[in-house]
Design a protein with these regions (language model features):
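Acidic, low-complexity, intrinsically disordered peripheral segments
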Residues: 2-4, 21-28, 411-444
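Periplasmic alpha-helical coiled-coil/stalk elements that build and connect Gram-negative outer-membrane
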Residues: 21, 25, 122, 138, ...
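Bacterial N-terminal signal peptides
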Residues: 10-18
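Bacterial Sec-pathway N-terminal export signals of envelope proteins
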Residues: 20-92, 141, 192-195, 234-276, ...
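Solvent-exposed loop/turn segments connecting transmembrane beta-strands
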Residues: 98-109, 274, 299-309
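Amphipathic alpha-helical coiled-coil segments
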Residues: 60, 72-87, 143, 149-170, ...
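A glycine-/polar-enriched beta->alpha junction
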Residues: 61-72, 78-93, 106, 110-128, ...
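Membrane-embedded beta-strand positions of outer-membrane beta-barrel proteins
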Residues: 95-99, 112, 271, 293-297
Length: 444
């Protein structure tokens, strides 16, 4: 009889607890599903190193699937998604115990206590944590895009170093040929070679050899940077170094670039997620007006008949000034986050204009070199060859003219490098830098 007399009260407590359950929201379910799906992509089969002569997209894909900073950002996002469920859950029940002891045990009263926070308050807290998980996802997206941008910049730098080294080696051959011809002219006295010209060429040769040594160091540094951008440690196998010449990337018009920036920029999306989180925190602050309560029961198993002692408590949110201040502070944080979104949009417009200026400046230089300077040097080379064949000029003029053309090609390569670095920043700004099959949600 005694156990049955306490059963109705215990059953009532369990029914009350089950009725206070807050189910996961649609946003929480979507976040959990998407984090699981992307986790399977990131932690799936080992990603092989790109094959020799692989396109840039293969290197980008390898980096965004393997780089530790991407995996760390994903784990942070996953942790924030998993933290939503504990936020909306009830506190753990408490097993209590009370006894009265004199010479003997007078009362023996175990009990069970449940703390209750209203479903509305826990829903608001869950919504705030869901907004925090959205911010964590935006941080993850920014990390993926930044990783891809680092790979592309390292790729541009490596391609520049390789091509510049080849051009400098061609300069060395042209100078060596000029020096040889000038030395023959000076020694035989049959040409127009002079000692000062021979010395000048020797100095130029030494300068080019020094430039080649610098470029070789630059190439080694670029390869190390490229390997690091891929997420490979120093003691891991080197990747197949890309052997693709730099080419100018075609960009959409300025209006389209701004539309993509406004819609997809990672930094702007982070600011907007922070604003959503600040809005959710206002609802949490408002729910502080709602009291919390606790109910439970204790049963004295020494008493006959069995004595059951119900207990209950309730919080009294009477300090209205404190509640109002917390709400006002949350609203101020929301206003600040909204203002930061506007400030970021203004900054992005200025950055877009600056990046486009750098691209156009490089385009102007490349156009001048390709359409004016290099054709002019080709005519100079043809004239020098014709003069030598007719006996009217020195053969040393031919390699010297070729050297000037090579130097101009190096100038073009430098302009193209600066252009592609600016293009990389533009692609990062518009969130177009990662390959199409990156570990990102379609909504990104």
């Amino acid at each position: 009889m005694k156990p049955r007399s306490a059963a109705p009260l215990l059953s009532g407590l369990l029914v009350l607890v089950s009725g206070c359950t807050v189910l996961p929201s649609t946003a929480e379910k979507q976040a959990r599903t998407e984090s699981t799906r992307l986790g399977q992509v990131l932690h799936g089969a080992d990603q092989p190193l790109p094959a020799p002569h692989a396109p840039l997209a293969d290197y980008l894909r390898y980096a965004v699937l393997r780089h530790p900073q991407v995996l760390a950002a994903y784990s942070d996002w996953q942790a924030s998604v998993l933290a939503i469920a504990p936020t909306r859950a009830l506190p753990d029940p408490q097993l209590t115990f009370e006894a009265d002891v004199t010479d003997t045990l007078m009362t023996f009263m175990p009990g069970l206590m449940f703390d209750f926070m209203t479903p509305g308050k826990r829903r608001a807290m869950a919504d705030e944590m869901t907004a925090a998980s959205s911010l964590a996802y935006r941080n993850y997206v920014a990390t993926v895009l930044r990783t891809a941008a680092d790979v592309r910049k390292a790729w541009v730098e490596l391609a520049y170093a390789d091509e510049a080294l080849n051009l400098r080696q061609a300069s060395l051959r042209a100078l060596a040929q000029s020096q040889e011809l000038a030395q023959i002219d000076y020694t035989t006295g049959r040409g127009m070679g002079t000692l000062s010209e021979s010395v000048r060429l020797s100095n130029d040769l030494a300068k080019v050899r020094s430039d080649i040594a610098v470029l070789e160091d630059r190439q080694r540094a670029a390869r190390t940077r490229f390997k690091s951008a891929l997420g490979l440690k120093a003691d891991e196998t080197d990747p197949a170094w890309p052997e693709i010449a730099l080419i100018a990337t075609v960009l959409p018009d300025e209006g389209e670039l701004w539309r993509r920036t406004s819609a997809s920029n990672a930094g702007l999306a982070q600011m907007r997620a922070m604003a959503d989180m600040a809005r959710a925190s206002i609802e949490v602050a408002k729910k502080a007006k709602t009291p919390d309560f606790a109910v439970g029961a204790m049963a004295d198993f020494k008493a006959d008949p069995l004595m059951v002692r119900p207990t209950a408590s309730v919080t009294l949110p009477i300090w209205r000034e404190k509640i109002a201040a917390n709400i006002a502070a949350a609203e101020a944080r929301r206003d600040a986050s909204v203002a930061r979104v506007s400030a970021e949009e203004i900054n992005l417009a200025a950055e877009l204009a600056q990046m486009l200026y750098m691209v156009r400046e490089a385009d102007q230089m490349i156009r001048f070199i390709e359409q004016t300077a290099l054709p002019g040097y080709e005519r100079v080379i043809a004239t020098a060859e014709a003069a030598y064949q007719s006996g009217m000029g020195s053969p040393a003029m031919i390699p010297e003219s070729r050297l000037m053309a090579i130097n101009m090609r190096i100038e073009r390569l430098s302009a193209l490098r600066e252009r592609e670095l600016a293009v990389t920043d533009l692609l990062l700004m518009t969130a177009d830098i990662a390959p199409t099959d990156s570990p990102l949600s379609p909504k990104s």
